[in-house]
Amino acid sequence: MASITNILAPVENELDLLTKNLKKLVGSGHPILSAASEHLFSASGKRPRPAIVLLISKATMENEIITSRHRRLAEITEIIHTASLVHDDILDESDVRRGIPTVHSDFGTKIAILAGDFLFAQSSWYLANLESLEVVKLISKVITDFAEGEIRRGLNQFKVDLTLEEYLEKSFYKTASLLAASSKAAALLSHVDLTVANDLYNYGRHLGLAFQIVDDILDFTSSTEELGKPSCSDLKKGNLTAPVLFALEQNSELIPLIQRQFSEPKDFEYTLQIVEETKAIEKTRELAMEHAQVAIQCLENLPPSSSKEALKLITKYVLERLY
């Protein structure tokens, strides 16, 4: 498997610059907010979302030369993503993410809420200054989608008749919406044909769904240390993901366990056993592969380039995280 560092080589310099710029962009006059923001962007990671924005920007520009507006869009994408994580961690009562303390565990819930709101507000300001109404419409809808996803997740906890379609819709709102919108936005800033821009929206959509589905598999198959957060955390809170939905199709014994919210001894352990013994993980892996393959097909209209190849490799890398 190619390392993510090698895959992102075409935008390595741009990502280095982005990392330096992020702390400057979210600087606040208030020392606590500044400290919280710096804490957020000090976390290590390859920042796949802005990397994809930068790769699409290069793949859609002549000679792969991108503009300052493309770079700013990549920064906005990461700021919005980070803001959503701050609020997610509060709602999930998570103390760690990527192996480091969350903002609310270090600074308290009030500061964390304000920090998340502040990041959303900052992203809106920088978004408006891109001076592209179409891009503003695309990206601003993402913030609405985040809220929609959280509402749906809250309303559907321990819902044993949740459909796969409902699960995928929630996954789109919470994960894939930002990737889809920012992918298309990068193309629009390159002034490409609308057909190509829509293809790239669908690339981001299906890649985002594949990424979320893989994450939901890893929640069952990886350790807390590997995940950087507690394993099986979604199931414990009643958030039924694809592995559980497929297991429910094959074994109805799961229904009473989930309906009583794992309140009796061994309920949770028996649920994990059923998920493992059915073909639920295998079927979920196939679902992720389907979305990844569609994502790759959406790149067909792009001209040959190293950035296009990197976009394909990212899609394959998402699946290879399972092995």
Curated annotation (Swiss-Prot):
InterPro entries: Isoprenoid_synthase_dom_sf, Polyprenyl_synt, Polyprenyl_synt_CS
Gene Ontology biological process terms from the UniProt entry: isoprenoid biosynthetic process; photosynthesis; quinone biosynthetic process
Record-listed an all-trans-polyprenyl diphosphate binding positions: 97, 174-175, 212
Subcellular location(s) of the protein: Plastid, Cyanelle
Subcellular location, principal: plastid
Necessary cofactors: Mg(2+)
The protein's name in its UniProt record: Prenyl transferase
